[in-house]
C-alpha cells in the first residue's frame, strides 16, 4: 500500500469508520513515515476475531512504511473500559492480568515485523508509566485537563448513565483519562501521531488527541475501523460455543478454518477486504468469477485459507485442510494424533467412554441416537461408520484396532453427524 493514498485505500476496503481531520492526516502521511499505535487490553488470555481488523490495520500501515506500536494495556486491563458495555466489568487480579499481558504480546508479535530497520514495530505496556504513578500526579497532571461535563456526554458513557439498573463506577469512569494519557505518553516517547481502534473507541481516542495537544502542543490524529457486522444482523465472530479466539488452544485451527468456510455469500467478499491483503481488483475478479461459474462460490475457501494462514501459519492451515478433507472423504488414514486432538478440542462433538462399550450404547451416549432401539435400526440399515468403515452389526463391541492412537474412535451417522469417542 503506497503511503500517499493509504487512507483512500483503507476507505475502498471499508476499513474506515471515522477519522479526525482527514485532509491533514493525508497530508501528514504524504510527508513521510509516521508512528501509530493500537491498544489491546488483556480482558482475557487471548485476543479474538474482534481484535483482528485493527491488528491487521497496524500491519497495513507497516507495509506502507510506517512504524506500528502495539500497546498491551497492563494498567488499563486492571480498570476495564466501560465503552458501550451494559454493566460493570469484573475486576481481575494483577497476577491474572500480567499473565494475560504476556500471552497477548506473544499473539500480536507474528503479525508485525520487529526487525526491519527504521519502521520496526515496538511492543509497549502502559503499566510501565501508570504502575509507579501516584494518585496526586494523576489528578494534577492528567485529571485537570478533562472536563467532567464533556466526559458524561460521550456516547460510550452516556448509555450506561441512562440505564436505571446500571450506573458507572469512578474506576471505569476514569478509564477515558488513562487511555487518553497513553496517546500523550506514546507521542512523547515514540513520536506517535495516530491512534487506530474499533469504532467503540472513538470517545477515548478523541480524548487522547485533546490531551496530547494540551500537554505537548502536538497535532495528532485518530482513525477507527468499523465494528464488523453480518448481513443477517447476527453478531460477527461468535459461534454456538462462544467467541472465536486467535489462540489455537482456545479455538483450534480446524474450527477456525471452518468458521470462515461457513461465511455467508452476502458477507464473504466484504470480509476478504477486511481480513486479507488481496488487492481489491483481485477480490472483485473473484466475485465476478463466482457469479458466472454456476458452481458453489470459491470465495469462502480463499477467505478461510488466507485468514487461517495469517493467524495459524502454513502448518496450521495444512492441518485444518487435511482434517476437513478426511472428514469429507471418510478416510482417516492421513490424520495425525495432533489432528485428533484438534477434533477432540472443538472440532466435532466428543464423548468419553469406558473400554468394553458396544456400538449401540456409543450412539446413544454420543447423542447420535435417542435410544438403543433406534440405534439398532440405524446400524442395521448400514448408516453408521467407525473410523470411516461401515459397520452393520448392532451387537458390535469396540476392540483395540478401533482405538486410533490408543485413544480415539470417530463415529459417523449418515453423512454429516459425527462424534469422537475418547476412550478412558
Curated annotation (Swiss-Prot):
Keywords carried by this UniProt record: Aminoacyl-tRNA synthetase, ATP-binding, Cytoplasm, Ligase, Nucleotide-binding, Protein biosynthesis, RNA-binding
Residue span(s) of domain S4 RNA-binding: 357-414
Motif 'KMSKS' region: chain residues: 235-239
Source taxon at top rank: Bacteria
E.C. no: 6.1.1.1
Protein location: Cytoplasm
Main location per the UniProt record: cytoplasm
Sequence motif 'HIGH' region, residues: 42-51
Any Gene Ontology biological process: tRNA aminoacylation
Single GO term (MF): tyrosine-tRNA ligase activity
SUPFAM superfamilies: Alpha-L RNA-binding motif (SSF55174), Nucleotidylyl transferase (SSF52374)
Residues involved in L-tyrosine binding: 37, 175, 179
Binding-site positions, ATP: 238
Listed InterPro entries: aa-tRNA-synth_I_CS, aa-tRNA-synth_Ic, Rossmann-like_a/b/a_fold, S4_RNA-bd, S4_RNA-bd_sf, SYY-like_C, Tyr-tRNA-ligase, Tyr-tRNA-ligase_bac-type
The protein's assembly and partners: Homodimer.
PANTHER family, sorted: TYROSINE--TRNA LIGASE, MITOCHONDRIAL, TYROSYL-TRNA SYNTHETASE
Family to which this protein belongs: Belongs to the class-I aminoacyl-tRNA synthetase family. TyrS type 1 subfamily.
Function comment: Catalyzes the attachment of tyrosine to tRNA(Tyr) in a two-step reaction: tyrosine is first activated by ATP to form Tyr-AMP and then transferred to the acceptor end of tRNA(Tyr).
Protein name: Tyrosine--tRNA ligase
Name of the coding gene: tyrS
